[in-house]
Every structure is written in C-alpha cells, then in structure tokens.
Amino acid sequence: MQLLATTLTFASGAAAYINSMSAPASVQRGQAFTAQLNSSIYVQNYDDFGVVWGLAPPNLNTSACVGCVGRRIGYTNLFGDKADVQVPPSGTVGVQVTVPADQAPGEYLLIAGASYLVGASGVTGFNYFNTTVQVCE
C-alpha cells in the first residue's frame, strides 16, 4: 500500500513536455501542413505555453544564433482554456502550420520555439526544435 501511495504522489507531480518536432519533407507555399509535436512525461510540473514557428535558411548556425527562428510564420497556443491543441502526457499531437504564399521555393529549416515554465522554482525559457523542409510551388 505504501508503494502505491508513493507512486501516486510522484505521478501527480509529473507533467508532459515537448521533446521533439517533425514535419513532412515537402510543404507547399500558401498551404497548411501538419507538424507533429512529440511529448514525454517529466517528473516535475512542466507547462509548455506555446510554439513560435519559423522558416530559416538551411545554413543557419543554430549554435551561434540561439533563439533564432528565421521568418516567423505562425504561433500555436498550448496553454489554458483557449489552447489551439492539447499536448498529450506522452505521445504526439498534430499542429497546422501555414507556409506564406510569398515564401520563395527552396530548402529551409522549420524551427519550433516552445516556451515553457518548469518546477517549483518557476524557471522559464524556450526549447528549440528544427527539421529540414523543402518549400515547393
């Protein structure tokens, strides 16, 4: 019985966090596509608030330009009563992202900047995920 109580105590403090993102290899300008946000269980309270979506040149040095998302193409609210989507405790959720009609065709990094708050200390920040996409006519 003690083991069950301990397990439930830890489980109640666990929360999901976004740990990766994926998208189709080819996307069409002026059209929406579905990007996938993948989540896992985290041992502390963890809130992902939203994702800023961007397209950047494929040669963007993300180590030298920490926090850069390139051209902002969208935002997805993940928090509260008016969230655009609900991130599951562990799994995947699809998010609609639209490529601007005036985006030049070519290869880009699709970058997702996910804002978060974690733990009792209230640490905030962003996690960044990227994948290469080909923008087509």
UniProtKB/Swiss-Prot annotation:
Q: Which Pfam families does the UniProt entry name for this protein?
A: Nis1 (PF19271)
Residues listed as glycosylation sites in the UniProt record: N38, N61, N130
Phenotype caused by lack of the gene: Severely compromised the virulence of M.oryzae on rice and barley.
Annotated region described as BAK1/SERK3-binding, given as residue ranges: 107-136
The subcellular location is: Secreted; Host cytoplasm
The superkingdom listed in its UniProt entry is Eukaryota
The answer to keyword Glycoprotein applying to this record is yes
Q: What GO terms fall under cellular component here?
A: extracellular region; host cell cytoplasm
Q: Which residues form a coiled coil?
A: none
- Identify this protein by name: Necrosis-inducing secreted protein 1
Q: How does it assemble?
A: Interacts with the host pattern recognition receptor (PRR)-associated kinases BAK1/SERK3, BKK1/SERK4 and BIK1.
Q: What is known of its domains?
A: The C-terminal region from residues 107 to 136 is important for BAK1/SERK3-binding and the host cell death suppression.
Keywords tagged on the record: Glycoprotein, Host cytoplasm, Secreted, Signal, Virulence
Hey, what's the signal peptide range on this chain?
1-16
Q: What does this protein do?
A: Secreted effector that induces necrotic lesions in Nicotiana benthamiana. Interacts with the rice receptor-like kinases (RLKs) BAK1/SERK3 and BKK1/SERK4, inhibits their kinase activity and suppresses INF1-induced pathogen-associated molecular pattern (PAMP)-triggered immunity (PTI) in N.benthamiana. Also interacts with the rice receptor-like cytoplasmic kinase (RLCK) BIK1 and inhibits its kinase activity, thereby inhibiting PAMP-induced ROS generation. In PTI, phosphorylation relaying by RLKs and RLCKs is critical for the initiation of downstream signaling.
- What family is this? Belongs to the NIS1 effector family.
Question: Key word Transit peptide present in the record?
Answer: no
UniProt xrefs under InterPro entries: Nis1 (IPR045469)
